[in-house]
Swiss-Prot record:
Residues 1-19 form the signal peptide. Pfam families: His_Phos_2. Catalyzes the hydrolysis of inorganic orthophosphate from phytate. Gene3D superfamilies: Phosphoglycerate mutase-like. PANTHER family: ACID PHOSPHATASE PHO11-RELATED, MULTIPLE INOSITOL POLYPHOSPHATE PHOSPHATASE-RELATED. This is 3-phytase B. Its EC number is 3.1.3.8. Keywords: Disulfide bond, Glycoprotein, Hydrolase, Signal. CDD domains: HP_HAP_like. Glycans are attached at residues 191, 315, 458. InterPro entries: Acid_Pase_AS, His_Pase_clade-2, His_PPase_superfam, Histidine_acid_Pase_euk.
Amino acid sequence: MPRTSLLTLACALATGASAFSYGAAIPQSTQEKQFSQEFRDGYSILKHYGGNGPYSERVSYGIARDPPTSCEVDQVIMVKRHGERYPSPSAGKDIEEALAKVYSINTTEYKGDLAFLNDWTYYVPNECYYNAETTSGPYAGLLDAYNHGNDYKARYGHLWNGETVVPFFSSGYGRVIETARKFGEGFFGYNYSTNAALNIISESEVMGADSLTPTCDTDNDQTTCDNLTYQLPQFKVAAARLNSQNPGMNLTASDVYNLMVMASFELNARPFSNWINAFTQDEWVSFGYVEDLNYYYCAGPGDKNMAAVGAVYANASLTLLNQGPKEAGSLFFNFAHDTNITPILAALGVLIPNEDLPLDRVAFGNPYSIGNIVPMGGHLTIERLSCQATALSDEGTYVRLVLNEAVLPFNDCTSGPGYSCPLANYTSILNKNLPDYTTTCNVSASYPQYLSFWWNYNTTTELNYRSSPIACQEGDAMD
């Protein structure tokens, strides 16, 4: 979600200047620096949680987030991952087994890096919370979704006239639906109950291509994914250190991985996690890379069929862009899972490493850092820009990709204002490169062969609010 740049925040607050103003040319004193020389984004634990931890904006290339002065956004197509959540039941089982080993020594005084355990309690109240979106703490999932909707109202509110009913779309999974509802409340405000129409799209395989969550059950490129070990040498070092500080725990490298998974979820429910400091920065770097491998080989470009899965959304959004707001509409807000966004990026051909990621070491500098791609609440926004002529570009329609509120250049197509891509070029590139989903994934001819719900939607408000109690471990897909 949009955040004011730390670089200029103090100046903007003090003077009312633009967030991109650089302030006075002459410092107030000879010792005062106009710009800080300290940048610590790479040390942020939020960038090494993989897809488990709270939302954070993508590290940008410095391209202005606002549209260029010669342009106006006239259409927005967004897909957002659900907000921050508790671990899944399967992850919870592994976490509880690792914690059982930690507590097996029956000590009254933990030592060293685990000294905080003398006062710590597990943040999951009981097993019914597994899978659920979090509602407590400053990083809570539902709070994230509401704030995001509110931020996008400020950014894109001009695309709604305040009167028409706007459809928005969620896959049929409990926490995804709740994210969509909270986002809708944030965006539409008092008008949510009357002017927003939530459409829930089943996650069933029989939906074929008419889905936010298309599947590829004939996938024949899962060997690497199926054999990932989720281990790097640093986890053995961590296990040895913790075992030496508190003898008798007998933690293994696998236990360390599961404890780090637990730690990476804790901030989703609490404002602070002592578990972060139980592991070193280097160990967190290794953990983040292990998560990168998981997404890359299981739901990203490391699986050759994922581009075809993502082509469903990429191709349908291309149709919207070419139809434009007058024919198709201006606002398309969609909600799904992390592993539905990564195939879309693969289909678009962005953030693709030059070679497959190595399994035995961290590939520093590779573009596939999942903490920058799909953290909790992560989102990909496609902007259609209507631009006036400038000294560098012609009047016309352009396309911009924005990933987690950072402009993501569309590979080599950056000749437009604000490094955008001319719509005609964007169209040509995708038409040439997008694989065919139904052929690649051998989709049954009895299933829908293309995405149609953006054009065939309901305008009723009956699904805007839940009508039943929250079930234990809610998260099962709805048919």
